[in-house]
Each structure stands twice: as structure tokens, then as C-alpha cells.
Regions:
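Acidic/polar-rich alpha-helix caps and helix-coil junctions
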Residues: 1-180
Length: 180
């Protein structure tokens, strides 16, 4: 009780809302707003792609070649659709790309899109920090793109498909130790 998100998920019934753990969110509205009946509530629209994502992809692409143009596109999107007071004053390409990625993570939170940014941009992942809610056994920090994001083919795929036998991503098991 008393956490910042308490009572903010107004489209679910109060009895179920009271049972949710702190900081549990329901990003997409359940079918007919009914979270109690799984045959109704599970039927909901889950966007595979959103127009907001396209604006942010355009801003990032522009920032890779021209930081000022990327910042201008980001400002246009943010001021038009999110926060009229937002102002990105960066012009360095790398800094603008990082700002766009931050805004993508905020906009597309919970949709699994940061996975692709982390891989493509060779970003580090930091899960061990003061105040983290990541459970200790999986609290990993990386230096660069995490190996756990590489898909490893199952062993028997190579047995029955010999051309891929010697071509596989390295198995990341045991590569990382949790940070205490």
C-alpha cells in the first residue's frame, strides 16, 4: 500500500487491483475493460507497431548522419505529441541518438523494443544499481551488448541440419555473475 502507482490502473476492477504487487502495471486495456474473465479480458489489441515508433526511428536515423536534424525531428515529435516544453538542444550525433533511444524507451515501455536498440547500438545493460528492483540472482551488468541477447540454436538443430553445425552463437550460460 502507498506505492506511486496505486489506483492508477483505473480500467481494472478494484478487487483485482488491490491484489497486484507494487509497481505492477497493465499497459494495454483488457478487452471490454474486463480483467476478471480471462476469455474476455485476454482479447485485447496489442500493437505490433505504432506511429510514435516510426517518428522516433526517423529521428534516430537522421541523428546518425546529422545530429541537428535528428534533434529537430525529435523536438517536433515531442512538442507536437508529448510535451510542448520539451527541448533537445544537443547537436552531437551520438548524444542525439542516446536521447532518442531514451525517449523510445519511455514511449515504448513494456513493448520489448529496447531489445533491438541494445543489440543494434552495442549498448551496455546495467541492472545492479542503488534502488534496483531486479532480483539478485539475475542482477547483471555488462560492458557492451549482452551475450544473452544472442540466440543460440538448440544442439540438435546442428545434428539434423549439418550446414549449421559449426555456425552458432556462443552459449552465454555462465558468462555473467550476478552483482550483489
Amino acid at each position: 500500500k502507498g506505492h506511486a502507482l496505486e489506483g492508477k490502473t483505473t480500467f481494472i476492477d478494484a478487487a483485482i487491483g488491490a491484489e497486484l504487487d507494487p509497481y505492477t502495471t497493465v499497459k494495454f486495456r483488457p478487452g471490454q475493460g474486463n480483467i476478471s474473465t480471462h476469455t474476455i479480458g485476454s482479447v485485447c489489441s496489442y500493437p505490433l507497431m505504432r506511429v510514435e515508433e516510426m517518428y522516433l526511428i526517423e529521428a534516430e536515423a537522421a541523428a546518425h548522419t546529422d545530429g541537428a536534424k535528428g534533434a529537430a525531428l525529435l523536438n517536433t515529435f515531442m512538442k507536437t505529441y508529448r510535451d510542448a516544453n520539451y527541448n533537445c538542444t544537443l547537436s552531437n550525433s551520438d548524444e542525439v541518438v542516446q536521447e532518442v533511444v531514451l525517449q523510445k524507451r519511455i514511449e515504448l515501455w513494456g513493448e520489448g523494443r529496447s531489445f533491438f536498440d541494445i543489440k543494434r547500438l552495442n549498448m551496455s545493460v546495467t541492472r545492479a544499481y542503488e534502488g534496483t528492483n531486479v532480483p539478485q540472482p539475475v542482477r547483471y551488468n555488462t560492458n557492451g551488448r549482452p551475450a544473452w541477447m544472442n540466440f543460440v540454436l538448440p544442439k540438435f538443430e546442428g545434428v539434423y541440419n549439418t550446414p549449421v553445425y559449426n555456425y552458432n552463437n556462443p552459449d552465454p550460460s555462465g558468462r555473467y555473475r550476478p552483482v550483489k
